[in-house]
Amino acid sequence: LRPRRQRQMCIRDSKWIAPSWPKVYGGLGEDISKSIILSETFAYRMSPGNDRFGVRMIGPTILKYGTDYQKEKFLNEITRGEVQWCQGYSEPNSGSDLASVVTKGDYNEENDTITINGVKVWTTLGHRADRMFILVRTLPDSNRHHGLSLVLIDMKDPGVKVNPIKNISGSSSFNEVVLNNVKTSSKNVIGKLHEGWMVALDLLNFERSGIDYIGWGERCLDDIEDYCKKNNLIENESVKNNLSSLRASLESAKIMTYKALWIKTQNDEINMEPSMSKILATEINIKIHDFAFNILSKKVTIFDDSQDSFSKRILKNRLFFVSGGILGGTTEIQKNIIAQRGLGLPR
């Protein structure tokens, strides 16, 4: 965590944490292209970079839906690099079907208190986070999309317990977060109380650009191409064809990702382009890492101390990026969004 925070402090001093945000909230007032380039570069360099949950998800959502109090409090602490955010959406029985969340947020109008009880899972960086944006059911007996609220809580509040979940790549970036009588107030609700569904969906559009996968894919492809050159594999016809094909597909996904991010700045509608770019970016990233893994297959079958850092990174990333078609909304859900919202097809 310390290197991440130290890096954020350096970026903060140059006001590059959120360059496209208004100056009053610590940004530079630049166009979205600066933020895109920055995110892609951080991913390419495998750098901890910015807090993507804060800078690219809840931050833009607060800018769009938040109150003056929320903007002043939460946006400035993000651009000062003081906090790490995490996302509280998925539950043990509510993943792709997000509207089925059951975590309760009982609202007491007398003392303006929301009492939260429930369990969230697959919470990336929950063990490091200072704050969480969480989707809860604040209207008793409500069903599906109705009666939901997007609420901000402090991870140090009484009643918040974080349990790490170890994944196949050996890391524990995912967590289970148990919430037992966690209290917050309506001033920490983004948008209107009980009407958070569309706010929560709009937030996902900020997440689903796929720009990180572009940076990671570019880095892996450059590295494996260098490896092939150094080990006399580059003249192999199959290797050359695969490298060329992957490079072309990556560039296509990159253009789609840029387009999706640009369209998001032009209108407020929840559209299909972020879903399209997420599918393309995650799938090409998986293909690139599969290719790299196959090239190195004799060297990277298990984690052990005899492997060089490059081989270890390829293996770890290959195992992790398999989840790209699940994280942030499954590929199947993205295809449904494209069909229904983009092409007007029936459910």
PLM features: residue spans?
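Single conserved hydrophobic/aromatic residue that forms the stacking wall/gate
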Residues: 1-11
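Internal helix-loop-helix
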Residues: 12-81, 125-131, 207, 250, ...
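Glycine-rich phosphate/cofactor-binding loops in nucleotide/flavin-utilizing enzymes
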Residues: 33, 37-38, 57, 199-206, ...
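A short, Trp-centered hydrophobic/proline-enriched beta-strand micro-motif
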Residues: 81-89
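A short core secondary-structure module
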Residues: 101-102, 113, 117-163
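A structural signal for short hydrophobic beta-strand segments in well-ordered beta-sheet cores
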Residues: 103-107
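Glycine-rich beta->alpha junctions and the first turn(s) of the following alpha-helix
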Residues: 160-255, 324, 340
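Short, charged, amphipathic alpha-helical segments
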Residues: 240-244, 272-278
